[in-house]
Amino acid sequence: MEDSYKDRTSLMKGAKDIAREVKKQTVKKVNQAVDRAQDEYTQRSYSRFQDEEDDDDYYPAGETYNGEANDDEGSSEATEGHDEDDEIYEGEYQGIPSMNQAKDSIVSVGQPKGDEYKDRRELESERRADEEELAQQYELIIQECGHGRFQWALFFVLGMALMADGVEVFVVGFVLPSAETDLCIPNSGSGWLGSIVYLGMMVGAFFWGGLADKVGRKQSLLICMSVNGFFAFLSSFVQGYGFFLFCRLLSGFGIGGAIPTVFSYFAEVLAREKRGEHLSWLCMFWMIGGIYASAMAWAIIPHYGWSFSMGSAYQFHSWRVFVIVCALPCVSSVVALTFMPESPRFLLEVGKHDEAWMILKLIHDTNMRARGQPEKVFTVNKIKTPKQIDELIEIESDTGTWYRRCFVRIRTELYGIWLTFMRCFNYPVRDNTIKLTIVWFTLSFGYYGLSVWFPDVIKPLQSDEYALLTRNVERDKYANFTINFTMENQIHTGMEYDNGRFIGVKFKSVTFKDSVFKSCTFEDVTSVNTYFKNCTFIDTVFDNTDFEPYKFIDSEFKNCSFFHNKTGCQITFDDDYSAYWIYFVNFLGTLAVLPGNIVSALLMDRIGRLTMLGGSMVLSGISCFFLWFGTSESMMIGMLCLYNGLTISAWNSLDVVTVELYPTDRRATGFGFLNALCKAAAVLGNLIFGSLVSITKSIPILLASTVLVCGGLVGLCLPDTRTQVLM
């Protein structure tokens, strides 16, 4: 009986020893596999695995193996029958430990403290170390994925969004004269349209940039572009000026998020050697947006025949068609963006390892198939993710209803955006943020300020040239005639019109002096900058015309009738004769950016971002002095093209530097803040330079030159990001 009991006891001990040994060997193999996966992209040595392949046991450093530890003679009677499953679990109550026990309980076995025992500073320090390791690994992964079809597809999708931003900036200036007059805007409120759009873009840049760091690049960009497209379309149909302002405000608010989100999104799928060049190529779409807006304005707005009316109150003029056409790039980008994935770098930053891995594999497979290498396997199996620091959200007890919960959620998100923004002024990016603030402000102030000043300087030159082309018709008689075409830039003096019919005529800059109209009919007539001075009308009928009393100067009416006069505000802005030239000059100025874009893209990675940034701003400041010698329209247009061509290189390099200087967790927020500052500087520049147009030419030139040169010198003090990985 005793022998059988001892045999069973020995058998049980032997089985436990075997199970314990198998467990240790399994742990060892799993640890080796995990270590190899983590070391694959961190360039660590694999020597620690070479001597462990055939080990009989796996022990922590500092412990030795005693071959008789499991023998009956070496075993303790006190531990006989003990099983590992019977041990007290961590977290069970084990009594209050002494001070010495507390010190030795965890640290003595060489295990790190749990996160629950660490303060926030320690956790953030560990997270920074994880982010540095992830940055190196992610760069190698992107290099393995290659640059190909996926990046080019995303390039064109994001390019459409950037094009929509460029269109939005130009739309304001092009529709401003027509919209203000068409919507019956008094002079006191005429400047609100331009300011309200920039205000919306300023707030939108800050909000959407911060949101992109919270919910993702793709989601933020989809929402902001949808807001822009919807309210841009809606603004083309509204009739009241207040509602029109509201629509343009929200349209600007939506498009404000395009630039910070687009550049952050695209930079995170580019390898280091491709980043500067391809971000510069992406900047070309902003220029394409300006060219598109200028060309459409040139082709659409001056054509007043492209309009219709529903009664006398609802007028749909050509500038509204222009607004609809300018919303098409935004709609196209929204549709295309739905087929693109989220930024994998953002997903890794927020701890979504599996989703990021799937997207990186998609990028790799897409590019390899395009290269004709579909059999090439994506070798990455594990990617480092930064330590996630939990943030507690306090939800009040009265948030039972859905709208209260929604309010708390919105308030929490806004508070999170604000905290991320404040971190842009923490170490190690605080100094860079201050320098970037100066560079963004000076470049925007000088660029947009002179952009307002140029057209106002050119306009008097255009007026003089237009006056030289005026056709003068004097002392002639016309009887039994019908005119149904456009009359433009003419002066009729001492004329007599008998039994004439003016049907559907567009009068543009036409003046009648000392003329007589007998038994004439004006039907469905539209006039712009047209006046009748000291004229006599006898038995004349006016049907559905826009001839307001102020257009008849010292004129006399005998037995005349007015029927169905057009009500509401008609397009009567005075300098319509220069509309073609204004759009054409803007078209040329935008087209001049093309050489600067090409040069900056080709040289960005060769001469460096800082050389490009500082050199372009200094050269732009110097080029302003040539404006003193501009005495003709063609010379001023040439100076405008030169200035725009030099400035665009500074804009491109500044975009690249800004993206590369901020880490992923605050990249879009920092970019959004700087872009919002850019819009504020643009408004300030418009106000200051606009007030100096009629005073002197020297002050705007000196101001712009000084600001640009100073900003360029500060830009040279920024750290060079050409060789660093994207944090």
UniProtKB/Swiss-Prot annotation:
Q: How is it modified after translation?
A: N-glycosylated. Upon expression in a kidney cell line the most abundant glycan on Asn-534 is GlcNAc(3)Hex(5), while on Asn-559 and Asn-565 the most abundant glycan is GlcNAc2Fuc1Man3GlcNAc3Gal3. Both Asn-559 and Asn-565 have a high degree of glycan heterogeneity.
Q: Which residues carry this modification: Phosphoserine?
A: 75-76
Basic and acidic residues composition bias: which ranges?
113-128
Note the effect listed for residue 565 to Q.
Decreased molecular weight probably due to glycosylation loss, no change in binding to BoNT/A heavy chain. Greater reduction in weight
Q: Which GO terms describe its molecular function?
A: transmembrane transporter activity
Q: Which UniProt keywords apply?
A: Cytoplasmic vesicle, Glycoprotein, Membrane, Neurotransmitter transport, Phosphoprotein, Synapse, Transmembrane, Transmembrane helix, Transport
Q: Which processes are annotated in GO (biological process)? A: chemical synaptic transmission; neurotransmitter transport; regulation of synaptic vesicle exocytosis
The residue spans the entry assigns to the Extracellular side of the membrane are as follows 176-191, 248, 302-320, 459-578, 631-636, 691-698
In this chain, where does the modification Phosphotyrosine occur? 466
Instruction: Please list where the region (Interaction with SYT1) is annotated.
Output: 1-57
The domain of life for this entry's organism is Eukaryota
Q: Write out the topological domains of type Cytoplasmic.
A: 1-154, 213-226, 270-280, 342-437, 600-609, 658-669, 720-727
What results from changing residue 559 to Q?
Decreased molecular weight probably due to glycosylation loss, decreased binding to BoNT/A HC. Greater reduction in weight
Q: Which PANTHER family match?
A: SYNAPTIC VESICLE GLYCOPROTEIN 2, SYNAPTIC VESICLE GLYCOPROTEIN 2C
Instruction: Write down what this protein is called.
Output: Synaptic vesicle glycoprotein 2C
What is this organism's lineage?
Eukaryota, Metazoa, Chordata, Craniata, Vertebrata
